[in-house]
């Protein structure tokens, strides 16, 4: 199976519009949560690159993948590609804790996002990505 990656075009159009359409199509708490996560990522790293990978999964990158934004029936999952290498003083990581590389945050309906802690985690990921 061929993997198709779509990166932001220079005018800021295609990928942003596709991610926005995905958010709108969800039309429930998952769309609202994904939209909020997306906004926080952009606040934490204004230079972030948005991509779509793996059959339409939003991916945010800066010198490497920061995280993905997957949606499931009962959760919005943010998977950090290098999460195991990050400090998580606020304890945001609550999924994929046993692996040697990735860590994830599962956000369920009604849960509050610790916005400051999430932005700090995004910035730490960018620092890690740019230091390699």
Describe these PLM feature segments.
Residues 1-132:
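Charge-dense, helix-prone N-terminal extensions
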């Amino acid at each position: 199976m061929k993997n198709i990656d779509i990166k932001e075009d220079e005018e800021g159009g295609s990928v942003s519009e596709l991610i926005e359409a995905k958010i709108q199509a969800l039309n429930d708490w998952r769309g609202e949560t994904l939209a909020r996560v997306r906004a926080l990522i952009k606040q934490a790293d204004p230079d972030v690159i948005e991509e779509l990978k793996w059959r339409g999964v939003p991916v945010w990158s800066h010198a490497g993948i920061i995280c993905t934004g997957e949606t499931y029936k009962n959760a919005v999952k943010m998977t950090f590609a290098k999460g195991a290498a990050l400090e998580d003083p606020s304890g945001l990581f609550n999924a994929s804790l046993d692996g040697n590389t990735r860590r994830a945050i599962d956000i369920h309906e009604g849960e509050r996002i610790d916005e400051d802690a999430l932005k700090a985690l995004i910035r730490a990921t960018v620092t890690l990505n740019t230091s390699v």
